[in-house]
Design a protein with these regions (language model features):
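Nucleotide donor/acceptor-binding cores
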Residues: 2-4, 29, 97
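NAD(P)H-binding glycine-rich loop region in Rossmannoid oxidoreductase-like domains
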Residues: 6-7, 33-93
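Residues in the short beta-alpha loop(s) of Rossmann-like NAD(P)-binding domains
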Residues: 12, 37, 105
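Short beta-strand "acidic-cap" motif of Rossmann-like dinucleotide-binding folds
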Residues: 31-33, 147
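N-terminal Rossmann NAD(P)H-binding glycine-rich loop of SDR-like oxidoreductase domains
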Residues: 4-26
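A generic structural motif
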Residues: 27-31, 193
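Active-site-lining helix/loop region of Rossmann-like oxidoreductase modules
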Residues: 9-14, 127-128, 136, 155-156, ...
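Glycine-/Pro-rich loop/turn segments that contact NAD(P) or position catalytic residues
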Residues: 79-163
Length: 213
């Protein structure tokens, strides 16, 4: 059976950690875990796992990690626009087509009502690079899914609903484990939600702001 080779960029993050847990025992999936500091992945090992230290903004390191991959899943923080540009370029250079890229709710002003106003007051000033990253990806020729999570919780649950670009965002919050479950599902079914920008939230969490505020 041919293994699907998956490159996880930002593999030390909390959502990525759940994705790794969902996928690490699937014999048909090989994970390359790319992150700045290997110590963030203590205890993660296996025959289908390769850990690489590197920086997404370091062209040569990213290019090396990208070779022979089938799917790239990026869950990053910081200069997301610059990172998106580097990732798209490296994928095109290496003939890798499938990209799953996590951004944020609010990048299209898609969050309605009082929650939309609250969200904008909290994170509106920092959303520009997230929107630019989505624009870079959406204008590429890649088979992308942009993922826009609601406010994140550490609840041990998988319970989510999706909205598409152009639709109003629904709930206020979602668990990191739920976002990871959706991403793991995309990795296992890579033809799903291609050329899509998907909002993800927990059903029934509509309101003026997340419950933990």
């Amino acid at each position: 059976m041919k293994q699907t080779k998956v490159l996880i960029l930002g593999a030390g993050g909390a959502i990525a950690h759940h994705v790794i847990q969902f996928l690490q025992h699937h014999g048909n999936i090989h994970l390359t875990l790319f992150l700045r500091n290997k110590s963030h992945l203590k205890g993660i090992k296996g025959p289908n796992i390769n850990i690489v230290e590197g920086d997404v903004l370091h062209h040569k390191q990213l290019n090396e990690a990208m070779k022979d991959q089938d799917i790239v899943y990026a869950n990053l923080a910081g200069s997301l626009d610059k990172m998106a540009r580097q990732i798209v370029e490296a994928m095109e250079k290496n003939g890798v087509r499938r990209l799953i890229f996590v951004t944020s709710l609010g990048i299209y002003n898609e969050v309605p009502g009082a929650f939309g106003k609250w969200n904008d007051s909290m994170i509106g000033n920092s959303l520009a690079p997230y929107r630019e990253a989505a624009d870079i990806i959406e204008t590429s020729d890649l088979d992308y899914t942009v993922v826009r999570p609601a406010w994140l919780t550490d609840n041990e649950e998988v319970d989510y609903e999706l909205t598409q670009k152009g639709e109003d965002f629904k709930g206020t919050e979602v668990s990191r484990k739920s976002v990871a479950a959706y991403i793991a599902d995309l990795i296992q079914h890579p033809r799903k939600n291609i050329k899509a920008s998907v909002g993800i939230d927990k059903p029934g969490t509509e309101g003026d702001k997340p419950s933990f505020y």
